[in-house]
C-alpha cells in the first residue's frame, strides 16, 4: 500500500434518532442515523406484516381457488 493516501481511521460515535449511541470505526468522528438495531422493527420483533391483497389473491378469490 502507498503511504499517505489512506484516510485516518478513528473511533466514531454513532447516534440514532431513538437516542441510542454506540462506538465504531470510521473516517468521521460522529455519524447520525435514523434507525439502528435498537429501534428497527426487524430486530425488536415489532414487525408488521402487510397483507398482500394483490391481483393473484383477487383472482383466487374470484374463481374459488385456494
UniProtKB/Swiss-Prot annotation:
Q: What residue ranges are annotated as transmembrane?
A: none
InterPro entries attached to this UniProt entry: Ribosomal_bL28/bL31-like_sf (IPR034704), Ribosomal_bL31 (IPR002150), Ribosomal_bL31_A (IPR027491), Ribosomal_bL31_sf (IPR042105)
Triggers of expression: Only accumulates during exponential growth.
Q: Where is the signal peptide?
A: none
Binding residue positions for Zn(2+): 16, 18, 36, 39
Q: Which GO terms describe its biological process?
A: translation
Q: Supply the Gene3D superfamilies for this chain.
A: Ribosomal protein L31
Gene Ontology cellular-component annotations: ribonucleoprotein complex; ribosome
MF annotations from Gene Ontology:
metal ion binding; rRNA binding; structural constituent of ribosome
How does the cofactor bind to this protein, according to its record? Binds 1 zinc ion per subunit. This zinc stabilizes the protein.
Q: Which cofactor does it need?
A: Zn(2+)
The family note in this entry says: Belongs to the bacterial ribosomal protein bL31 family. Type A subfamily.
Subunit record text: Part of the 50S ribosomal subunit during exponential growth.
Output the NCBIfam families linked to this UniProt entry. L31, PRK00019.1, PRK00528.1
**What is the protein's name according to its record?**
Large ribosomal subunit protein bL31
Please report the organism this UniProt entry assigns to the protein: Bacillus subtilis (strain 168)
Gene that encodes the chain: rpmE
